[in-house]
């Protein structure tokens, strides 16, 4: 229209899309799938795994001599030559003494050897060979989906190799793809791998937001120390079958199933139900279960003490003795404060009616966003205590904190514009504001309850 009386300027304020990192988990595969190395494949149901599992390879001959079996495959097997021992599973042979899972040395592109003390005899029926990790991965993913609906998971293929090869490949993947996966369920064979402990040490910081779910044993769990906030470990029950290589898969499922909200607050990890997994029995095991619990480990127990027949997670700890919810809450607060404040800054630069500027009003806006985030944390079962706001200088805030003023509360402090600019005279020029501080206590659950009972004859 020519010569309009009114012009309308339009800006758009967009809400942040939820950050889904804490719902992202992955199983480690070492040659169990047909996908390329460093490939992440999303699995939404068990049948998705079936289509990518490696098929057995035909063996053309197997011979025995002086305690060593030599296997020749019909086609090149694809296992790395000279990289150390690799666990392979042989099946379908007659005599059956050649069947089983063995630590194999790859000698050529079509041959490998393994130690076999007794000569099974001449082969009359040739069988097949497959990476041992295929069965393990299939069982773990089967048990994962047995926990319930509503969860998907990734498979990260690291390629066939030794446990050390797998750790090296995962280390490189994590360096190249930070913040991609929140939790990994690692193969039980990694429990004895020294390089894995080095990898764990790289993600022990309070900001790491990465967790490893580990299957260990009563003889080796002491490897996992109080520094390892990024590890949750579990010892399988002695009666767990071969189809249950990693009982901790139930805890892994629960960890990435969390999606806290006002209608679904975060529940404690301890005593959550698991399905299809083998619980420890108290008969003859009380001492070791007490030791596992005292060492901040986890195990599958029974709900019988509460009159419930379901198997449950006992412990719910990270290796540094914290309840799992402690670190989940800290991660959630980091992720969502970043998300919500960044969203406010971006929207503020695209709002012509009320742009976000570096002044007291702008600081007030950012503080209100942080307050809203922490109010959600409280409502979602992540933070203990009511949310309060303060606008104190750095010195005054430190004094109040040291005096215990914020005990039992969640405080969101914003250093006022004038005092902050005086304390940090170069920051205004470069647009940097470091004046928002949040103090909160992660919401935890009960672990043990003591009831005092006094029986009296006084009437």
Locate each region found by the language model:
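A glycine- and small-residue-enriched flexible loop/hinge signal that marks low-structured segments
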Residues: 41-44, 169-355, 366-369, 373, ...
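Short, surface-exposed beta-strand/loop "edge" segments at domain boundaries and coil↔beta transitions
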Residues: 32-38, 78-81, 119-124, 190-198, ...
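Structured, hydrophobic secondary-structure cores that serve as assembly/anchoring elements
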Residues: 1-54, 316-459
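A structural detector for beta-sheet-dominated domains
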Residues: 11, 28-30, 44, 65, ...
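Glycine-centered structural positions embedded in regular secondary structure
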Residues: 26-29, 127-128, 249-255
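Residue-level detector of short, conserved catalytic/binding motifs and their immediate flanks
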Residues: 102, 182, 436
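Small/polar beta-strand repeat architecture
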Residues: 56-84, 91-134
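Small-residue-rich
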Residues: 1-56, 131-223
